[in-house]
Amino acid sequence: NVPVKGMICLESIGYFSDEKGSQTYSTPFHKLTMGTAGNYILVVSRKEDGEFGKAMTNKMKDAGLISTKSVKGLKRLKGVDLSDHRNYWKYGYPAVMITNTAYYRNKNYHRKSDTIETIDFRRLSAVIHQLNMVVREL
């Protein structure tokens, strides 16, 4: 057995848009609280992720290299468990998903038009640098 502090899932972290209306959500509430421009990264955690989830969320927001928002991954939120963190949650391990919200933002997601030209490398790099800062502090 190896002790696991937590799992960090990177899901679709390279597509950004400052255009209003570029970000959609599964609930109207999130549109009101998070806005309609897809220009941020999202940290998804659950209360069961405990201190790891709290630390990841707070440190990502505090790092300040890229706008960061958070949401608790309630099962009723469509798509909240559609990535590699799902099985960690299933077996009781703390896990967070760092995402740009995939198909809620990127209309190219899993299509032929999902090409390297659609990646915002400046902001993708900011996400990676921010994660590097956060992981070093955990």
PLM ranges: what are they?
Residues 1-16:
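A glycine-rich helix N-cap at a beta->alpha junction
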Residues 19-21, 25-138:
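Active-site-adjacent substrate-binding region
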